[in-house]
Amino acid sequence: MQITEAMRNSTENIYQQKVNQVIDYISANLHLPLQLDVIADKINVSQRQLLRIMRSALNESLYTYVARQRIERAVLYMQTEEMSLTTLSSMVGYDNPQSFSKAFKKQFGISPKAYINELQSRLEGYVQSSGNRSSLQAEICYFEGLELVYIRIFGKYGEAEPYEIAWNKLMLFLKDNQALTLETRFIGLSFDDPNVTNYNQCRFYACASVKKKIVPTGEFGTIRLQQGKYAVYTLKGSCSGLQELYNNISVNFEHTIRHGMAFEEYISYRTENSKENITKIYMPIK
């Protein structure tokens, strides 16, 4: 009985590791065709196994997931800078603007230009209704980059129970691997914009910096946060104010954003007195 349970856990760990590999590979290569046989070869499974594993993990087909990721990445790019439809299409893996526009309309029901105008109007409405000040103070810094170990959460950003479970698992993993030190930094990677993506499909990586080599194991993966120039905003108080701050940044951003990963760093965190919490948001800039 114990052997059977151990085998089941081992198989589950292998599957979780493969899911991490696929999701990270897709995220880094949305500009490519992303053929099924290539992805299956990368994780050493058949195409049929790949589709089955990923449907179970994503609660949607792999084809639907990739198509959705391409379009949602395009929205991010459109918010970053103005570009031709031809350039935008190629950046998210479409051969021509016609195919891209058709896929975009299938997902959102309107054209890319109409959608981005509607999104901007919606964000401005959020900021006005919150009564938030338009002026934002940002420090400019050059970030050296970090090696991270992560655990992924699918679902509504900041939902108490899954986040608490994930962070506790991450802390235990760090301790088990003797990777928790006084220099460990705690990072949050939000891959999706809840103003664009359904809240239950948002991907969050709870991360910790590591100095030593960590082998990806089960649900724990590794990722590198790239070096570069960032505008850094500070939130004092509960993390529940993060989305309001992100909306304010989107509407009142005074820098030229570059393609890169925005991230959060949790400088101090207390559940019993959240007013003393300090969170920094790093926005990649040119």
Regions found by a protein language model. Give the residues of each.
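Basic, low-complexity segments
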Residues: 1-9, 37-58
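Short, Lys/Arg-enriched, Trp-marked, Pro/Gly-tolerant hinge/linker segments that flank
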Residues: 1-21, 57-61, 68
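Residues at or immediately flanking beta-strands
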Residues: 33-35, 84
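Short helix-capping/hinge SLiMs at alpha-helix to coil transitions
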Residues: 28-32, 80
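A solvent-exposed interaction/effector surface
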Residues: 24, 48-53, 60-64, 68, ...
